[in-house]
């Protein structure tokens, strides 16, 4: 049986080292990319880098890191669907059981290069699949997440559903910041290309 896996990719690194350490102590594997992976490795945390799972290095100045079937398949597979699990096995993809992502505060320094695509995609994928996957977007939740995993062996369905709601609120807020930025550029950009 595979270990439980958490994918960590955070802008706000508050508490992430302790969180990862606790997960490892509970038998979890940590997957990470970019600045989060570097931060964890520098702190002595054993990390499986996303590039190891995808077989592809990040590209386009970091615009493409986690947008890959080996990541999203591992997040989106319905664990109660035998065909999903068989397909993952046939493709050599392992499940990802917990996605920990928080997004760059776009309103603080807006611009095209700071629009995150992969982060929101992972958050939304995990939230969609809350029956199988937990998603954490708030560092203040790390302690309660660890406590619940330690006590119950995993997150309850109720907790995963609450976290999914928080996740969709997080991505909605992020998207609203981007819309606001475009609204400020209204004179420069057309409302529609049609």
Indicate where each model-derived feature is located.
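A short, charged helix-loop
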Residues: 98-110, 117-158
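Short coil/turn connectors at secondary-structure junctions
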Residues: 2-5, 25-28, 43-46, 69-72, ...
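Glycine-rich nucleotide/cofactor/substrate-binding loop typically near the N-terminus or early
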Residues: 35-106
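Solvent-exposed alpha-helices and their adjacent loops that cap or buttress functional pockets
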Residues: 1-2, 21-23, 64-69, 89-95, ...
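N-terminal glycine-/serine-/threonine-rich phosphate-binding loop
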Residues: 1-53
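General beta-strand structural signal in soluble alpha/beta enzymes
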Residues: 8, 29-34, 49-52, 77, ...
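ATP-dependent carboxylate/acyl-activation modules
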Residues: 3-8, 13, 19, 59-62, ...
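Active-site loops and adjacent core secondary-structure elements that bind or stabilize anionic groups
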Residues: 140-148, 152-194
């Amino acid at each position: 049986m595979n270990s439980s896996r958490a994918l960590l990719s955070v802008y706000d690194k508050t508490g992430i080292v302790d969180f990862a350490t606790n997960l490892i102590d509970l038998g979890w594997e940590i997957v990470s990319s970019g600045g989060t992976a570097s931060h964890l490795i520098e702190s002595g945390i054993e990390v499986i880098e996303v590039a190891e799972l995808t077989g592809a290095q990040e590209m386009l100045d970091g615009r493409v890191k986690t947008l890959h079937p080996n990541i999203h398949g591992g997040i989106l597979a319905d664990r109660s669907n035998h065909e999903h699990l068989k397909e993952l096995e046939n493709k050599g993809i392992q499940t990802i059981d917990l996605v920990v992502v928080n997004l760059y505060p776009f309103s603080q320094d807006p611009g095209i290069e700071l629009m995150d695509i992969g982060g929101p995609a992972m958050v939304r994928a995990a939230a969609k699949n809350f029956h199988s996957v937990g998603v954490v977007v708030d560092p203040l939740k790390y302690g309660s997440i660890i406590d619940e995993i330690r006590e119950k062996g995993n997150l309850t369905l109720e907790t995963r559903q609450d976290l999914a709601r928080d996740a969709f609120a997080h991505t909605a807020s992020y998207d609203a910041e981007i819309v606001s930025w475009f609204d400020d550029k209204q004179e420069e950009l057309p409302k529609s290309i049609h």
